[in-house]
Amino acid sequence: MAAQVRVLRQRIRAAKSMKKITKAMELVATSRIAKAQEQVAASLPYSRAITEVLTALASNTRIDHPLLTPRERVRRAGVLLVTSDRGLAGGYSSNAIKTAESLLARLRADGKEPSLYVIGRKGVQYYRFRNRPMMACWTGFSEQPTFADAREVGETLIKAFTAGVDDGDGDPGPDGVFGVDELHIVSTEFKSLMTQVPVPKILGPMQIEDRPRSEGILPAYEFEPEAEALLDALLPKYINTRIYAALVESAASESASRRRAMKSATDNAEEMIEKYTREMNSARQAGITQEISEIVGGANALAASGSEV
């Protein structure tokens, strides 16, 4: 019995240590959710403003720009996948990868060759383990992304998109860049603390809704400098802003998923502690009962032997 009690004590100590760790990780994830939500809210006014300006530019001018004009024939499509750098986040990364795989299969079915770009160690490890080619990958900022991180990713994607696919031989262009005719992004939308959904979106070319001028939504503008110069300056910023918004929302989703996973682990540790404590108490009671029985049995034996004398 003593050995069993000792083993159960060790298990209780281990469960308590695990509970402290998972509780701390839950609290850290909770604080990061709030910070990521603040980043999302802070980026919205700029995102709305740049979208309105670009919509006005595209609606009031007839300029062909690589980031605005759909290609007649899409031969290669770039796909940016956002995953996490660390584990212990439930199904966050695996769900994003599953959504990306569905998109890749759909692109192939449409006769488009996918070019994969990956953010996050989990996604990079997944594709490297399977010997799947990646055009570029980035790690180290999935939990706390900055606009500089988004700009670095955006520059790579914009370079590939503006290069386009010159021919069908599958080789890179003269500058070593594999051009693409279309850009997609797979990131996780933050719906609530309990719900995060990975979704694919088109990143380029920018989709502009044609609105009748009679609606009066977009007034007449005079652009200084020229509209073409404004487009050259603003469209890359628009792509970078879209990527940054996806990164911060994915960061909030990752933290929410990790918080949920760590809360579940903390609850499981609490249940283990209660279970082992009950088992230890039962073992101790059984040991005490056995000792009392042995003492009573010995006393009775002594009494019986004394009466015989």
Curated annotation (Swiss-Prot):
Any single GO CC term annotated in Swiss-Prot or TrEMBL for this entry: plasma membrane
Listed GO biological process terms: proton motive force-driven plasma membrane ATP synthesis
Origin: domain of life: Bacteria
Topological type in the membrane: Peripheral membrane protein
Chief localisation class: membrane
The keyword Cytoplasm is assigned to this record: no
Subcellular location: Cell membrane
Entries under SUPFAM superfamilies matching the protein: ATP synthase (F1-ATPase), gamma subunit
Family annotation (InterPro entries): ATP_synth_F1_ATPase_gsu, ATP_synth_F1_gsu, ATP_synth_F1_gsu_CS
Keyword set, alphabetical order: ATP synthesis, Cell membrane, CF(1), Hydrogen ion transport, Ion transport, Membrane, Transport
Name of a matching Pfam family: ATP-synt
Entry's Gene Ontology molecular function annotations: ATP binding; proton-transporting ATP synthase activity, rotational mechanism
NCBIfam families: ATPsyn_F1gamma, PRK05621.1-2
Function statement: Produces ATP from ADP in the presence of a proton gradient across the membrane. The gamma chain is believed to be important in regulating ATPase activity and the flow of protons through the CF(0) complex.
HAMAP family assigned: ATP_synth_gamma_bact
Subunit structure, as described in the record: F-type ATPases have 2 components, CF(1) - the catalytic core - and CF(0) - the membrane proton channel. CF(1) has five subunits: alpha(3), beta(3), gamma(1), delta(1), epsilon(1). CF(0) has three main subunits: a, b and c.
Similarity comment: Belongs to the ATPase gamma chain family.
PANTHER family: ATP SYNTHASE GAMMA CHAIN, ATP SYNTHASE SUBUNIT GAMMA, MITOCHONDRIAL
Protein name: ATP synthase gamma chain
